[in-house]
Amino acid sequence: ITQYFKFISNNMCCGIKEMIMSLQVQGLSYAHPNKDILFQNISFSISSGEKCAIIGNNGIGKSTLLKIISGLIAPASGSVSCDYTPYMIPQHFGQFNDTTVGEALGVASKIHALSAILDGCGTVEDFTLLNDEWDIQERISDAFAHWEIDYVTPDMMMSSLSGGEKTKVFLAGLDIHHPSIVLMDEPTNHLDTKGRTLLYEFIHRTNNTIIVVSHDRTLLNMLSATYEMSPTGMRFYPMSYREYKETVDAAVAAKVARLQNQQKELAKAERLAHKTMERQQKHASRGEKQSAKQCVARIAMGNMRNRSEVSTSRLNKAQQEKLQDMHHELNEIRKSISESTTMKINIGNSNLPDRKRLVEVTDVKYRYDGRECLWQDAPLNLSIYSGERIWLQGDNGSGKSTLLKLVTGILRPTDGEIWRSYPLNILYFDQEYSCIDGERTVYGLLEACNTNKPEHELKMLLNRFQFPAPTWDKKCASLSGGERMKLALCRLLILDNVPDMIIADEPTNNIDISSMDILAETLKSYKGTLLIVSHDEQFVHDVGFERILRI
């Protein structure tokens, strides 16, 4: 943690920032402890004040790259050159469970030094440590108030805070430390609408160098540059994500047009080859008949036939090579298009009639052990009918996730009643897609569904869901968020059990943009009841909701 928040005070005091600053990454590679290569040959540079996004599929190594840049972990090879120590806003906070807020922010020692000095027992070390930051407590209070966590104090344990509150603690660190380079790993994952708005405002007004890993397209569209990361390198697009997407889509459209043209050319070449072969066969047949009538010497006839066969063989070989080249090019185009297009999944439709009452919530309250009662002053009352598409909104801590668990039956209300239609088939997705058993292998999970489908059919389905043969023996615990989502939908198809209602709690939090597009398209085409919590407005727009429920 000390290394994590090792700031050079003369770089960060009073928000003063030198104009000459850059970040250079050269030939960076990283391998897992088992020697499997995650990425290699990553090189790029970022100039002072640039605001950029790093995008790429789940599991490509974006978060690992940020950790290397921040100095948290070392690369297998390559180098990082940075004019200032970067400030990192992490995606996960487990490493801070046993620390206080002040320790996590790297200000606890300064607070203690200031207290000792004010108490009249300060040492030379205390004055050195404080470094003339006499206003450190005021800066902390102002920063916490700005990010709407004024009730948080530096001596509180990080483990006592929610995910959104932890994110806001690190965002408050921006106002406390005034770093010149900021690294953000999925900063909006746990933020409610108000928190996201504050972050967007910071991105808009700051002159700092910002490097963001995110699937929040609103945030990505605020950045002026996009770096596309792959296992073999980094590709730079001097544009926002929206413009990048338009560029990529145009390239895919050009590939589709090229594919269609290539298919026509291939068909034309195959027809020509077929006609040429027919012509040669007819010519050879006529030659044999004519030779027989004219009693051509047997040896002369043999020479003619040999010359004809050699000529035909050469022609056939040239045509075959041309056709093989065209087939190869066609397959390469198809592959590149397949990698760039959204996978289509149809999970079927509910058979329930529209407007059938499915759930009735009456005067419900809920209390977690040791915490205040949710909805104490305004108990929840609501009805859910079949065919409704409901977007559940609310600030952090308002009880959205709790309500979803109450509706599914995972939790029981402390007060009040919840009635459900019977039978009611509910599919519940939490943020981690916990319906996927992490101890099973990818293939073993489908096999455990106890269906009558043969092995080859299960493996064909896995291939369709972008799980090739090398992934079948992987433990599900090692899958990325997007892979877990696709496997959950694949499992749903295997069970052949279309849900009456799909309930999802921030289902896009841990998946990449391509997986978000797949999920949005799947839910958009689903004809049934939806109850979803999401702060991603683009995802909500893509899915399409008819009712907004705010708690």
Regions found by a protein language model. Give the residues of each.
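ABC ATPase nucleotide-binding domain signature region
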Residues: K51, T64-E125, E228-P231, S386-D395, ...
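Pre-Walker A (P-loop) beta-loop-beta motif of ABC nucleotide-binding domains
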Residues: I42-A53, N207-N208, P379-W391, G528
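Conserved D-loop/post-Walker B switch-helix segment of ABC ATPase nucleotide-binding domains
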Residues: D192-E201, N509-E521, Q538
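Catalytic Walker B motif of ABC-type/P-loop ATPase nucleotide-binding domains
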Residues: V182-E186, L191, F429, M501-E506
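Coupling and communication elements adjacent to P-loop NTPase active sites across diverse families
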Residues: M19-A31, K110-T167, T247-G370
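GG-anchored amphipathic helix commonly corresponding to the ABC/SMC/Rad50 NBD signature/C-loop
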Residues: G164-L183, E483-I503
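ABC-family P-loop ATPase nucleotide-binding domains
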Residues: Q95-S160, D430-R491, L495-D500
